Amino acid sequence: MNKSLKDSLTIGLALFAMFFGAGNLIFPPNLGLEAGDNWFLAVLGLLFSGILIPILGIIVISYTGGSIIKLTRPISKNFYRWFILAITLFLSLVAIPRTGAVATEMGIQAIFPKIPTVVPVILFFAITCYFANDKSNVIDKIGNILTPMLGIILLVIVLKGIMTPIASPVETHLKNPFSTAFIGGYQTGDLLASFMIATIFLSDIVHKGYTSDKARNKITLNAAIIALLGLLIVYGGLLYIGATGSGIFPQGTERVELLLGLVTMILGRVGVVGLAIAVLLACLTTSIGLTSSVADYFNELSDNKISYKTFVRIICILGILIALLGVEKIIFITNPVFVVLYPISIVILLLGLFHKYIPNHGSYKGAVFFTFIISVAEALLSIGVKSTLLSNLISMIPFSSQGFEWILPAILGFISGSLVFKEKSKTKEESKTKEEYI
């Protein structure tokens, strides 16, 4: 095996591990349950938002210079600061607490159902705090064992669930399986994570000797394809298994309960225990890694006025308080955050993907601004704000019934921003010419 192929495989598996979080396992089966016999359309929706778009995040950052700063510079010189701050707050208040909640409900309570929730949650974040404080390399070594372990267990579940399905998918009368799964894919948070991990990931590629843009981009693309296939097998398989349970489990079954119920029917109690242990340990390593990264970021943001260890403790205390709400409540209360951040992130991604063909910086500014406005409006409605005018206005926008109300505003913002920027540039040029003439 030549060096390029070997490195592509190694980096591709590493990228798969970065995106493949134990906390995300609960989403595909639930989407399959909702889609029923329309599971294939749901797989396509999840493929785009939960797999393809996050991986494109890494590719686009590589192709636009290798950093989120360069990707977002056309929007505003300091836009990336606010954008990264928003993502970091998401990790602090959503992703990290969710790992604790999933570890408790799918890990500890799956084996010991009578244990009070507060006990494993406090223990989980105490361990997180201990290891994150030390920045121990032991966690990296454990992670290298746990990711393959979890992957093997899931592969067994997926293969068994596909080869000997528990039942046939039934009709569920879901109107828009593609868009439901597409929007459901927001909950993985992987696109937001891709903007955070891209620099580290790309630095590793350069460290391996791929220093030119062409070489770096080639390895990135190869690795992305490998990661995409791995995620498609796992997420697609879990979604299909959820669909096979659509005639057994009632709609609205809680996500953790559904996944544990499916695994019990496929592999019995042994499968549940194996999955619970792997998920518990994988959630722990994810929590430690995220806590360390977020604490580092806030420590730098404070110019070292507040210590790294203090931020670790703050994050863990917040993690305990939010994790005690439970997985379902965390998902419910964080939905508005995704409704705002994800459309903006997708627009930034698409602008970066086609950056060579973008007429001017006004296109970036207009597209992102219009997307932000409509996304905030939709988020307000999603949390129960009563506004007949706002609701009627959004319902008039094409694709709003499918959850894509931001597409047309983004296009209009792109066009209007481009025209305004062009006119301003023309006016400046004319003024400059007059001054030179005078």
Regions found by a protein language model. Give the residues of each.
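A generic transmembrane alpha-helix motif of multi-pass inner-membrane proteins
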Residues: 157, 164, 361-438
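Transmembrane helix-boundary motif of multi-pass solute transporters/channels
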Residues: 8-46, 56-57, 69, 201, ...
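Membrane helical hairpin/interfacial module
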Residues: 34-126, 133, 284
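Hydrophobic, membrane-embedded alpha-helices of multi-pass small-molecule transporters
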Residues: 10-20, 25, 88, 92, ...
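Membrane-water interface regions at transmembrane-helix termini and the short interhelical loops
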Residues: 63-71, 125-146, 207-210, 320-332, ...
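Transmembrane alpha-helical segments of multi-pass small-molecule transport proteins
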Residues: 10-13, 17-19, 47, 82-86, ...
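Hydrophobic, small-residue-rich membrane helices and short re-entrant helix-turn-helix hairpins
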Residues: 134-145, 177-181, 201-230, 247-260, ...
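TM-loop-TM module centered on a large, flexible mid-protein loop between adjacent transmembrane helices
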Residues: 68-74, 233-284, 291, 300, ...
